[in-house]
């Protein structure tokens, strides 16, 4: 069963390569995937949120979700699962960016993108939240497009990031509610 799922994962990547890669889109996808290197996009957004008193709690939520994503995705699961990158094992898959130095599962880019974007979607005016979700989806897709993740890596990143975002929102609201009761 697991072998079949792994095979399907690879076949989806080859299908994307065959039917959805276009020269004009490739440079855009490379730029989108690089947007999230080291989490920089979401970290910058979080810093901006923390600087404004009106959005500070949203900044706390995003920061907590991003830290959770770093720990769960990049420190724990990548090393625990130790899944080889698809470009190393899927015959015919062409890598469009430089080789990655860590393991494949789950997608850290996707996890951190959804961790922050879901917070923004839940807590900011919808136009900002929707923009954040669109960027997160584009980053997730770019990881497939450039050949560094399997679809299941990206799906796991979406799920983990979303759960961490929801827990972070709940936790910060709970802490803020307790602070108000103490005063």
What do these predicted ranges mean?
Residues 1-40, 74-101, 182-183:
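N-terminal transmembrane-helix/juxtamembrane module of multi-pass inner/ER membrane proteins
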Residues 64-78, 129-142:
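Small-polar-interrupted transmembrane alpha-helices in polytopic inner-membrane proteins
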């Amino acid at each position: 069963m697991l072998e079949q799922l792994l095979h399907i994962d690879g076949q989806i990547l080859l299908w994307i390569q065959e039917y959805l890669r276009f020269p004009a889109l490739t440079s855009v996808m490379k730029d989108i995937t690089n947007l999230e290197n080291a989490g920089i996009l979401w970290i910058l957004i979080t810093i901006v949120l923390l600087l404004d008193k009106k959005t500070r709690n949203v900044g706390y939520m995003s920061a907590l979700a991003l830290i959770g994503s770093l720990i769960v995705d990049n420190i724990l699961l990548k090393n625990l699962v130790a899944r080889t990158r698809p470009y190393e094992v899927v015959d015919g898959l062409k890598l469009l960016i430089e080789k990655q130095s860590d393991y494949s599962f789950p997608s850290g880019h996707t996890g951190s993108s959804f961790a922050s974007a879901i917070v923004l979607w839940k807590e900011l005016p919808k136009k900002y939240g929707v923009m954040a979700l669109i960027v997160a989806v584009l980053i997730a897709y770019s990881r497939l497009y450039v050949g560094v993740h399997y679809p299941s890596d990206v799906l796991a990143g979406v799920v983990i990031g979303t759960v961490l975002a929801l827990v972070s929102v709940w936790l910060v609201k709970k802490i803020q509610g307790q602070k108000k009761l103490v005063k």
